[in-house]
Structures are given as C-alpha cells and as structure tokens.
Swiss-Prot record:
Residues 1393-1437 are annotated as: Contains the active site of the enzyme. This is DNA polymerase III PolC-type. Required for replicative DNA synthesis. This DNA polymerase also exhibits 3' to 5' exonuclease activity. It comes from Bacillus subtilis (strain 168). GO terms for cellular component: cytoplasm; nucleoid. The keyword Kinase does not apply. SUPFAM superfamilies: Nucleic acid-binding proteins, Ribonuclease H-like. Residues 421-578 form the Exonuclease domain. Residues 613-1437 are annotated as: dNTP polymerization site. The gene is polC. Belongs to the DNA polymerase type-C family. PolC subfamily. It catalyses: DNA(n) + a 2'-deoxyribonucleoside 5'-triphosphate = DNA(n+1) + diphosphate. Changing E427A: Destroys both polymerase and exonuclease activities.
Length: 1437
C-alpha cells in the first residue's frame, strides 16, 4: 500500500514537471502511477512504465507522450508503455490510435504502409479487420505484421488484438500495381547507385558537404513539376515544389525521425511527411527551415490522421527562392511614396519590416509609410529603417473633408418665397462630365407653390448605352435613336430657364454636366443662375435622418416618386420636396438665397461632407508634430464612420507637411474623371504634388463603369501629368501598396470579404496593389513615353524624398513629470515615518538603508514617481480601500515609509510601538519578521510588533540604483475608476491618458475568415492551404483598446503630441478617457506609466472589513489556526473526504489552484516565510519542478532553505561572504535563466555555498520577486483569517466578489446535488466548456461551505441584494444577479423598483422591475413569487 502511494506520488510529481496538472487532465490521471522507470545510461534513454485505471483518450495520450519527450529532451530520449487495469475497447478508440500505431511501425514496406494509412480498421471482438488488394498482402499482414501492430497497441495499454484481412480488389489490378512499382524501384536503384558513386568520389576528394540542402536523392532539373492545385487524388511518385511556411521535426517512440512540413506554390498548399531513413537524414531534416524553397518527390496519399491528401516524401531538395529583382541602375531606382502596413485597418497585410527589407534589397534609397488615417506603424517603421539603413518617410493617407458643402451656388440676394425655380435632372451615359454625355434632360418650373411649366427631352449620344445605364434609367438605345443632338437640347434648355433659380438633388453632379456642355457645345461660360442643392439642404434641415437620398426623403414626406432614375419623374418629386424644404428653412429664419450657406461650416458639417483621400508626408519634426495633431483631431473631434480632417484644420497645421493627391478616391483623380479642366485645375492647386498609379490599380473603375475604357483611363492619367506641368507641381507614380507580392492579394481579399457589404471594396474585383519594382512601374507607364515615365517613376519620386529630413518619431529619453519640492517631501516623509516607528535616534541599519535609497531615488530624479504613487495610495487608504503592491516595489524601504507598500524590506525585527525599542536579526537565521515568536518589550512591557522580510533594495532599482522604478499597484476593482480619475486631479486632464493598445486579427479569428471565404466562394481547401491563408491574415489591425490599468503621464513642460497622437479606445467617441494612439509599449521608455490595476483581493478585504468591523491591518500574520489550512483541513472542521481537497486553501488567493495545493501537500508549510517561498516557487520557471521539489523530496534541504524568490540569492550569497556586487550580478543572471560562469561557481564554492545550491541556480529560467510574493501572501493570510474564524463572512465575500458563474439551483439543494454536478463536469474532461470549468471552482467552495454546516437560501424578492450575498443566520441569501441570464443592470432595476413600493402582482414586477418573461418564470418556478397574483387586482373599496 505504501509502495502504491509512492508510485502515485511520483506520477503526480512527473505531471507537475511536464505541466499537466490542469483539472482537464487530472480526471484521467486520478489513479495513475509510475510502475517502473528503466534507465539506459549508455544510450541516454528512459522508458516509463505507467499504469492507469482505463485507456486514455488519444488526445490525452498524445499530449502526455509529447510533453514527456519535450520536457526531458536535454537529458534523455524518452519512451513509454502503458498498462491498464480495466481496458474497455471500442472501435472508435482503436481508430483514434491507428495513425499513431502506423507511424511507429518499423521495417514495413511502403506499399503496405500506404495501404494501412488509407483506411481505419473495423473491430470485431478482439480482431482488427483491414482490407487488402491481394492474397499476398493479406498473408503478409496476418503472418508478418500482425504481431508488430499488436505490440504497438499493447504499448498504448490495449489488450492483445489480432489482425485479420479481407481482400477487395482483383488480381489484374495487383499485377498492374506490381509492374508499376518494379519500374519505379529499378529507377530508384539506378539513382541510388549514381548517388553512392558520387558520395564515394566526394569522400575520396575529402570534400566537406556544402551547397543547398538535399535529403534523400537529387531530383533532376528536367523532372516534371506538378502544380499543387493539380493534385486531386492519390498518386504515385510525383514531384512538386514550393515555399516552406511551416516545419516541425519530431522523434518517434520507435527512434525514427519524422519531418512534417507544409509548402505552397501559391496555386495551393500541401502537407508533406518525410521519415528519416538513416541518421544522416535526421540531421539534415533539422536544417529544413521556414522560408526555404524546396522540391519534393514522393507519393500522394489520403492521411487518415489529418484527414487530407498529404505527400509522403522520399526526396527533398532545396532550390533557389523565386524572387523579383529591381534591375534599374544604381541611382535610378524609384521611391515608393504610397504604402500601407497592417495598421491600415483590415486592409493591408504585409508587415512594414518586410516591406522595408524588400525596398533595401532592391536598392531603393527611401520608402514612405501612408496608412489609412493612422500612424500606428511609425515605431516599427523607425526600427526597420534603422535596422536596414534606409530613409523612412513618415506619412498618412488622410480622409480630407470640406468644412461644409454649399447648399447654394452663385449666391444671390433673392427672396425665396417670391422666386421662380427650375427643378431639373439629367440622365447620362456615365458619371464623368468630361467623358460621358447627357441622354435625357427634364425640368419643371415652380412658382407660388405650383408647377407652371415642364421641359423634357432625350439627347442622342451617338454610341450604345451600357447595360448598367439601361438597367438604372430604363432608357434604351431605341428611345434615343431619333432624338436631337445634345447641343440642341442644351441650347433649348438654356433659353427656357432664363435667370431662374436652378434646383437639383446632388446639384454638383447635374451642374457639372450642364456647365461642361455649356462650354464644350455652346462655347459659353458656365451657368450664372443661382442654384440650390436639395441633397445638402436636406442634410442641413434633417440631420437626424440616416441618409438623404431622394427616394428616402420622398418616402419620409409622402411624396410620390413613380420611376426613380428617370429625369422627369425625379424632377417632379424634387419640386414637391423643395416646397416642403423652403417652408422648413423659413422656420429657421432663412428668407434669402444668399442666407442658405451661412450655416455651412457649423456643428456637424464635417459629417455631411464626402471624404477624399489625400497623402500627408512629414518633412521635418514640425511636420511630424502637426501630423500627430491632425491624427488626434480626426479621431477626437471629427470622427464620423472614419477619422476625418477638415480642410481648414489641414491648412492650419500644414507647416512641415507635403500634401499629395492620393489614389482614385482623391479629388484630383475624381475631378479629372468627372469635372471640367478649370475645376480640376482649381482643385489641384491645393496640393504640393500629384499622384498617378498604374492603370492596373484603377482597373476596378472600368468594372464599375466609372471610366469608359482602357483608353479613357490612360487619357485621365496623361491629363494629370499635363496638369502637373501646367501648375509646376511634381507628378509622382505611386503603387498604393497593400502587400509585398502579387500572390499575397488573396490575404487582403479574405480580410475584405469578411467585412461583407459594409466595405465598398467588396463591390468589385480588387486591383493589384503589390510592391512594384522600378522596372514594373516604368513598364506600367510606358504609354506616356520613356522620358515621361522615367520622370514620374524615378526623378520626381526621388525629388519628393529628398525634400524630407531624417525624422525620429520615437524619442530616446524618459520624460517624467516635475513636482516642485518632491525631493524634500519624500526625504521628510521617509524620516518622519521612520522616526514614528523606530524612534528619534534611528537604528544604524534603518538610517543607513534610508540614506542609501534616497541617494539613488533623489539622485536619479525618481522622487516624483514615489510621490505620485504615495498620493494615489494615500487617497485610496483615506477612502477605506487597502492597496496591494506588485512587482519588486516592496524591496524599497522608502516605498514602505511613504505607504506605497505594506512590505517592509528590512531584516526581520521586533519594534516596540510604545517606546520604539528594536531588535534586528540580520544574520539570515529568520526568514520573515512575522515568524518571530511573540515577545514583550524589555523596557516597557508592551507587546512588540514583528516585521521585516530581508529584501535588498538592489532588486528594485538595480545595483547602481539607476533603473527607472516600475511601481505597479493593485487597487480594489470597484475603486480603480476613482484612482484613475484622481490622476486627472494630480496632473490635469490634458496630461494623463490611458495606455493605448492595438487589437489585431488573432489566429482563431483568421481561421473563421478563411473558412467563411471558402464557404462563400464554394471552395474546398486542403488543411495546409487553410493554414497558409490563416498565417497571411493574422496580425492585421482590427481595433484599438486600452490597457486595463495603465495611465500615461505627460510632463507639463511637454505636450502629448511630442510623443504620440491621441484617440478614443475603439473609436468610441463617448468614452470617458482618451488613449495614446501608439501602442503603449512603443513609448514605454519615453513617458511615465502608472500601473493602477484593479484586483479582487482589496475588494474582498473591504467587504470583510465592512461585514466584521475588523481592521485588516490588525489581523495577526501568524495565527496558528490559519496556518493549519496550508497543511490540512482540521481548522475548517471538515475532513478532506468531505470537501475533496487535502488542504483548506480552496478560494484563498495564490493558494487555491490545484498546482499550488499539490505544492502545499508536498511541503506542509508552517510559517509566513515558507508561504512566501511557495508563492515564489509557484510563479517561477524551473524553480520548483525538477529543482526545489526534488531537493525537498530527497531530504537534501528544507523548504525554508531552497531558492524561492530572486532576492533570496543575493541575500544568501552576501551572508555566505560574497561581495554584494557579485551577489547582485549572480542573482540577475540566474533570475533571467542565464546560469553561472565557471568563475562565479569557483567563488561560491570558496565561500562554502553547497553544490546543491549551485546546481539549483543553473536550472532556473525565471524567478519571482520576493516583495511581490510577500505582498500577495499578506493579502492571502488576511483573507484566510476570515475563512477560519468568520466563515460565513468569508463565503459571502467570496461569492460576491470572485465568483461569476453560479448554479444556484444546485447550490440550494446542498452537498449531494453539488457533488453530482461536479462529477458530471469532471467526467467531461477536456470537453468541458470554459463556463463549466469556472462553475466547477465555485461549486468546490459551495460544497466546502455546506460541509461546514452552512447553506444557501433561494433568491428572495424582498431581501435579496442586487449583487451581494447576504448573511441570514447560518445561510446566505443569493443576489438577483446570480440568477441565470439576469445581469447586474437588470438586478439593480428590480431593487430600485422594490424600493419604490411593494409589488402588487407578477405583472407589476415585470413592468416596474423591467424583468423578462424568462426571469419571471424562473422566479415563479423556484417559489420566489408565491404571494403574488398574476395580475393587478382592482379594489372597489
């Protein structure tokens, strides 16, 4: 029996070492044990013999064996076998293990392996039935391979299973197969002979292997290469090639090496498996890396494990990567001035680092970054440019809007109610006033509220109409065949309108066509008539409407619109709409035509303007700061669907910026498509340079019929270059880059597709916007002639780049706030508090420590950080909430004396609160002052206070005391918002911001996008192709957010725009806080970040204080009954069988998890310092598992002696006699996992540091600070005190603050019901949902509470709180928000309604309490509404 417990304990230790102690695993490992461990020293191999109660699910088995192999790979090669007590075998579990069984087999011919891989066996009794093609195969399987398969299954824990075979193919097929295989084998034999001769020759010449990677045999250059999209089914011996985007090498239990990698040739992707045939292969496989291009030769098979077609490769050869070159001569390379990174939200996919690297490889001197409306890639761009030695131009593609769109044109002082109006509409062949023509012009004259005349005419365009125009307007070619020419129609219309006021819906369009026709056809000036645009007038009068389209407005005002998009019907409807609008305008005091534009730029006018794209490039540091200001304005004050920059603001902050005309969504290109040359010239004069892009980039405009044909498109581009010449503005050719290579476009397509109709880019085929070489760009613009192409592609882009300075968007130094007198205040506060504790004549150890710390703190300008932290903590303490410290701030005595932390870092000591007598223990004999025995003052008889944790200051600010202090504070979660707002009081609202974060597309989300895209387009994708596409879509910006506790402080001698733009988190313009636009990590070293975190522990402590009246600071830290819960359950009055736990620490912070509870079982701590050790051990990496755990288990040392926290190392080594500076150095190296140098080991040995201690140091990877551990344990001990001595108060606080998921129905029923639900959840294992796992923790505490003699009542309509569990005798009344589906707001509504008066009926409760029918039924079903009638009763008296 004792041996059994040892075996199980060893297995539990092993599980901790391989990190498999989660509840999801432990369900299967409950009765597991290590029966034997066989060790072969010569071969460095270990074999574990496990025993389990039942067969492990394959997923669990696979995880166990993988972690075993990985965990001990540096020590030995690990294998294992399993013995099962109750092996219940099903066909499904046999099939789950099948692929692993086949992988592990050795010495089986490839055809048989292929045959077995293509199927899963059937189970009949104890027989595995597989299908074969021939008698020979069947005989081989039964006679030769059956025992091998049986042995493999036995290793997994299965009973003996016999293999049987059924034949299902003809002998003819087999013969054909044999002949084919014979031919292949002969060819491979010949090739093997050639390779052997080649190797022998190389060996004779004593040449070292070099050159590209070759695994297996060389693949000939002339061998046919199959594209991956052509592979549709299983095939024998084909060759493919592609880019390796994922690779994994693993050693199988059999000793063979398996290499699994995925390649793509951008037509598709495939997973390739290759088994090493010899040691040389295995070594070479490790050289196969992601990013290589390879050829692979092998067979295509259906893999039952991955359920997909895969290649089983025999040969893999590295080949030269396919890359594009920029062959333009040095000095004649282009500069890309329009480029997007993944910070262009859900639109661009290639990281800025890769784009910069490519530009450098091509020999480009500079590159510009111009993300959509943001500058969040600037920090990464700066790093990449510095790394690759290339000039970075920092810019942005802005959404430019006019401050207000005119309602009236050609303003005239004419009384609106007396005027005659011509309401007109044109139908056209397209949208371009320059390249398209009018096909219908209709108008009505309105005077005195009535239509007095009509004009209607078709015009012959002398070219066929497009299908789109016919569908949109209902006008056909036949209807226009006999119509007059446009010139005649325009002439007649001009005469008919006279000088009346013209009215149109979206007048800029109609007037554009009219004015071009006037000039082009009649050769007269554009119309001088006053104009009213009913679209803009509608936006001004009815801003609450979602849109202001003609049909929308007509529907709103019950105006009949018979046939929309036919001119005559549109004009009549617009006429009646005008009459309504003029009446509403008059009510706003608008009487004259020239008053219509008076409100143009006011209020939300920026929302009514359509945004145009414009490129902004920062020329110098002034420009950079102005760019930051514009980004901030666009996100804070002018955000409407997208961040917008009003033209007036751009003019205001234009200094230091170059403004480019951007893409087809810029106003210059659109103007050249649709407006007269004079108008475009006027528009272009605003810009510093004009942009044109390759015709391919504008291809969607042809699809959308915005441009008639390729010829018209090239004419527009040519006209922009001519306009640049005329205005003496450089015209530059840009690529509008969204990804690196053309094959990357699929990633962008998937991201845009995921946004559905919300993204207008989904309405057309996406253009090709890869990063183009100089040659590609020159070719794209060759239609302009060689000289002009070179000018816009090379000369002008270099010219613009030369205008830009080298700019640093990120600063080098830290800029902390300044508070007058901070140094003196911290010094005075420290000494005042020290003297109040230790007396006017401070003990030398105290004064020396204070002076040492103040020298560093004040000397390096850190006093202000201490003072700020002090003010924040003091405010919280004054408001009744304790604050817990995190990190190593408790290493600073000054932090203790200024009340930033409760942790006292001095050596353990007594101090008298009455006469200040003190006694210090600075020899290392005591771990914590809290562990000293109680003692009275020898001078005055007062009980002495015990304190001190012996933590060196160096662990906080470094040995020289010059490390920037990182003070993290745990405030109560419910007090955190007040602490945040207090920083506004301390520094001013314009000097504090929440630390910004950027949320990118995660792997799971990308997987959803890829699957959605495949489904929408009826694509069947192989798993490898899905993986490739997922990789390409991850990391793209999806949203922004804020750090949960980080507050960035800008000193008052700087402003935020010196460091970062600002915005609202997730562009939520109603947010209380603004955030930094940059991710806070980017400016972490430039500005002070206060970590004001929200934590449950202070909230629990506050609730317990309120319930009990006990000041938590008076709670003893060495209460014997409290200490017992860390060893057992005795002080709770229950047995471990009752609560299913061997300790009493369920629900105690830091000590309630299964992993730490196991540590407690192993170590049985009895003191505060040992609890601190356990906290340090549990948070470190390789500090407990395989290290301290073994030292304690093997009785080499006690818990108190092992290395638990990083500070222990420095303190211990100083006590042993090492120089403090060396002790500090060793601590820093060890805590970062860097081990020890031979010199340090020698010095440690010279000072009698034991060998086990030195070995322990060498194993550690990461260590926890002792101050952090001490702060956590202090909170834990205080909460544990209530659990032991005030149980119901503890449970009320726990369930109120910490628990989120309840099953109140079960909890009310008591222990038996709770256990049953817990067993159900445990039985689900890995399949249990996150909600169920959270509920399990709550139920553990509920069970413990019930077993201690307490109970839960049902929710009470008149006594339940909204959110808190209420104590009633020996039971708890649950709050309303514990009811399933009832949130906190709904719970508060019920309580509010209850306070207003008693509920008369269920109907009254539902109405006043805003309770849903489901919640009402729940309350009724559980007897909470017994006294209430269904409906209100009317009384006659």
């Amino acid at each position: 029996m004792e041996q059994l417990s040892v075996n199980r304990r060893q297995f539990q230790i092993l599980l901790q070492q391989i990190n498999m102690t989660d509840d999801t695993f432990m369900t299967y490992f409950e009765h597991g044990e290590i029966k034997k461990l066989t060790i072969h020293k010569a071969s460095k191999s270990w074999h574990f013999h496990f025993q389990f109660k039942s067969l492990l699910p394959f997923q669990i088995y696979d995880t166990l064996t993988t972690r075993l192999t990985q965990s001990f790979a540096h020590i030995a090669k690990v294998t294992s076998s399993i013995e099962v007590q109750d092996a219940e075998v099903s066909e499904s579990i046999v099939q789950d293990y099948w692929s692993r069984c086949i992988e592990e087999l050795q010495g089986i011919s490839p055809p048989i392996i292929s045959l077995l891989n293509q199927q899963k066996p059937k189970l009949k009794g104890n027989k595995l039935i597989v299908k074969t093609k021939t008698d020979t195969e069947a005989a081989a399987l039964k006679n030769k391979y059956s025992s091998m398969i049986q042995a493999e299954y036995r290793q997994f824990g299965f009973p003996d299973l016999q293999l049987d075979a059924e034949i299902f193919v003809s002998e003819q097929e087999v013969q054909k197969f044999r002949e084919q295989k014979l031919a292949e084998d002969q060819e491979r034999a010949m090739q093997a002979l050639i390779e052997m001769e080649k190797k022998d020759k190389e060996s004779d010449e004593d040449q070292a292997p070099s050159g590209p990677l070759v695994i297996g045999y060389q693949i000939k250059d002339n061998e046919e290469i199959r594209t991956l999209d052509s592979i549709m089914d299983e095939e024998r011996r084909i060759t493919v090639q592609g880019y390796v985007f994922d690779v994994e090498t693993r050693e199988l239990k059999s000793g063979r090496t398996l290499c699994i990698f995925k390649i793509t040739d951008y037509t598709n992707s495939i997973l390739i498996k290759m088994f090493a045939r010899e040691k040389e292969d295995a070594a070479l496989m490790k050289s196969l890396k992601k990013g290589m291009w390879v050829k692979a030769r092998g067979s295509i098979q259906n893999d039952t494990f991955v359920r997909d077609l895969v290649m089983i490769a025999n040969d893999v050869n590295e080949i030269k990567a396919k890359t594009r070159e920029d062959s333009a001569p040095e000095g004649e390379k282009r500069v890309e001035l329009h480029l997007h990174s993944p910070m262009s939200q859900m639109d661009a996919v290639t990281g800025i680092g890769k784009l910069v690297e490519q530009a450098k490889k091509w020999g480009h001197e500079a590159i510009a970054l111009t993300d959509h409306a943001v500058v969040q890639s600037f920090p990464d761009a700066y790093s990449a440019a510095k790394k690759h030695g290339i000039k970075m131009i920092y810019g942005m593609e802005a959404n430019l809007v006019d401050d207000g769109v005119p309602i009236a044109y050609n303003a005239a002082h004419r009384l609106l109610e007396e005027e005659t109006y011509v309401v007109f509409d044109v139908e056209t062949t397209g949208l371009s006033a320059v390249y398209d023509t009018i096909i219908e012009l209709a108008a009505v004259k309105v005077k005195g509220g009535e239509i007095i005349d009509k004009f209607e005419a078709f015009a012959n365009p002398h070219r066929p109409l497009s299908a789109t125009i016919i569908e949109l307007t209902g006008i056909t070619d036949d209807m226009l065949q006999d119509a007059p020419d446009v010139v005649d129609v325009i002439r007649d219309f001009r005469e008919w309108i006279g000088d009346d006021i013209l009215v149109a819906h979206n007048a800029s369009f109609d007037m554009g066509f009219l004015n071009v026709a006037y000039k082009k056809l009649l050769e007269v000036e554009k119309a001088k008539n006053p104009v009213i645009d009913t679209l803009e007038l509608g936006r001004f009068l009815y801003p609450e409407f979602k849109n202001h389209r003609l049909n929308t407005l007509c529907k709103k005002f019950d105006i009949e619109l018979t046939q929309h998009h036919r001119a005559i019907y549109d004009t009549e409807a617009t006429a009646y709409l005008l009459l309504k609008m003029l009446k509403d305008a008059a009510e706003k005091g608008i009487q004259y035509h020239d008053e219509l534009n008076e409100n143009m730029g006011q209020s939300n006018a920026y929302q009514r303007s359509r945004p145009y794209h414009a490129t902004l490039l920062a020329v110098n540091s002034t420009g950079l700061k102005n760019l930051f200001k514009l980004v901030s304005l666009s996100h804070i004050h002018y955000f409407y669907r997208v961040p917008r920059i009003p033209r007036s603001q751009l003019e205001k902050y234009r200094e230091g910026l170059l403004i480019g005309s951007a893409c087809d969504r810029g106003e210059v290109f659109e103007g050249m498509m649709q407006k007269s040359p004079e108008e475009v010239e006027d528009i272009a004069s605003f810009y510093d340079y004009l942009e044109v892009q390759p015709p391919e980039v504008y291809r969607h405009l042809l699809e959308l019929e915005l441009v008639r044909d390729e010829k018209a498109l090239k004419e527009i581009i040519a006209n922009i270059t001519k306009l640049g010449e005329k205005l003496n503005k450089p015209v530059v050719a840009t690529g509008n880059v969204h990804y690196l290579n053309d094959e990357d476009k699929i990633y962008r397509k998937i991201l845009i597709s995921s946004q559905g109709g919300a993204n207008p880019l989904n309405r057309h085929e996406l253009p090709k916007v890869h990063f183009r070489t100089t040659d590609e760009m020159l070719e794209a613009f060759s239609f302009l002639g060689e000289e002009k192409a070179k000018e816009i592609v090379v000369t002008n882009t270099q010219k613009v780049a030369s205008l830009v300075d080298d700019i640093k968007p990120i600063k080098d130094d830290l800029y902390t706030p300044k508070i007058e007198g901070a140094d003196e205040e911290i010094r005075e506060m420290s000494y005042q508090r020290a003297r109040s504790i230790y007396g006017e004549e401070l003990p030398e150890i105290v004064e020396a420590r204070i002076e040492k710390e103040l020298k560093s703190i004040i000397g390096h300008g850190f006093a202000v950080i201490y003072l700020i932290s002090h003010k924040l903590v003091k405010r919280s303490l004054d408001d009744g909430y304790l604050v817990g410290s995190r990190g190593s701030v408790g290493s600073s005595l000054v932090a203790t004396l200024t009340e930033i932390t409760e942790v006292n870092p001095l050596p353990p000591h007594y101090v008298c609160p009455e006469c200040q007598h003190s006694e210090f223990f600075n020899d290392g004999s005591v771990g914590s002052g809290f562990d000293l025995p109680d003692k009275t003052c020898p001078h005055c008889g007062t009980p002495l206070k015990k304190d001190g944790h012996d933590i060196p200051f160096e662990t906080f600010l470094g040995f020289k005391g010059d490390k920037v202090p990182d003070i993290d504070l745990n405030f109560s979660g419910e007090y955190q918002p007040q602490a945040h707002n207090y920083t506004k009081v301390l520094f001013g609202e314009d000097n504090v911001y929440r630390a910004g974060t950027i949320g990118t597309v995660a792997e799971k989300t990308a997987y959803g996008y890829v699957k959605g895209y495949a489904g929408d387009n009826n694509l069947h994708m192989r798993g490898a192709e899905i993986d490739r596409l997922v990789q390409g879509c991850t990391g793209v910006k999806r949203t922004t957010g804020q750090h949960p506790g980080g507050i960035i402080v800008v000193p008052d001698y700087m402003d935020i725009y010196d460091f970062s733009p600002i915005q609202f988190p997730a562009d939520a313009t109603g947010s209380e806080w603004k955030t930094t636009h940059f991710d806070f990590h980017s400016i972490h070293d430039n500005l002070l970040k206060l970590d004001i975190l929200g934590h449950d522990d202070p909230t629990v402590i506050r609730m317990l204080q309120d319930l009990s009246g006990i000041d938590p600071k008076t709670i003893p830290t060495d209460d014997p009954e409290v200490m017992k819960i860390f060893q057992g359950t005795e002080s709770l009055g229950v047995t471990e069988e009752q609560i299913g736990c061997k300790t009493g620490t369920l629900g105690i912070p830091e000590f309630g998890t299964r992993f730490v509870r196991q540590m407690l079982e192993d170590t049985k701590p009895t003191t505060f310092s040992e609890l601190v050790q356990i906290s340090g051990l549990s948070h470190g990496t390789d500090v407990w598992l395989g290290n301290a755990q073994e030292l304690i288990h093997n009785n080499i040392c006690e818990l108190s002696e092992v290395i638990g926290c990083r500070d222990d190392i420095m303190v211990y080594l100083i006590y042993q006699g090492l120089e403090p500076s060396l002790a500090f150095k060793i601590m820093e190296f060890v805590r970062k996992g860097k081990g020890l140098t031979p010199e340090w080991e020698e010095e440690m040995k010279n000072n009698n540091v034991p060998d086990w201690y030195i070995d322990s140091c060498k194993k550690i990877k990461y260590m926890f600070p002792k101050a952090h551990a001490a702060a956590y344990v202090l909170m834990a001990v205080r909460i544990a005190y209530f659990k032991v001595h005030h149980a119901l108060l503890y449970y009320a606080a726990y369930f109120t603050v910490r628990a989120d998921d309840f099953d109140i129905d079960t909890m009310i029923k008591g222990s038996t019901a709770i256990r049953a639900v817990m067993e159900d959840i445990n039985a689900k294992g890995l399949d249990a949902s996150p909600k169920e796992k959270n509920l399990l923790t709550v139920l553990e505490l509920a069970l413990e509470m019930c077993e201690r003699g307490y109970s839960f009542q049902k929710v009470d309509l008149y006594r339940s709180s909204a959110t808190e569990f209420i104590i009633d005798g020996n039971s708890l009344i649950p709050p309303f928000n514990s009811i399933p589906g009832l949130g906190t707001n709904a719970a508060l509504n019920i309580v509010k309604a209850r306070e207003e008066g008693e509920f008369l009926s269920k109907e009254d409760l539902q109405k006043r309490g805003k309770v849903s029918k489901t919640i009402l039924e729940y309350l009724d079903r559980h007897g909470c509404l017994e006294s209430l009638p269904d409906q209100n009763q009317l009384s006659l008296f």
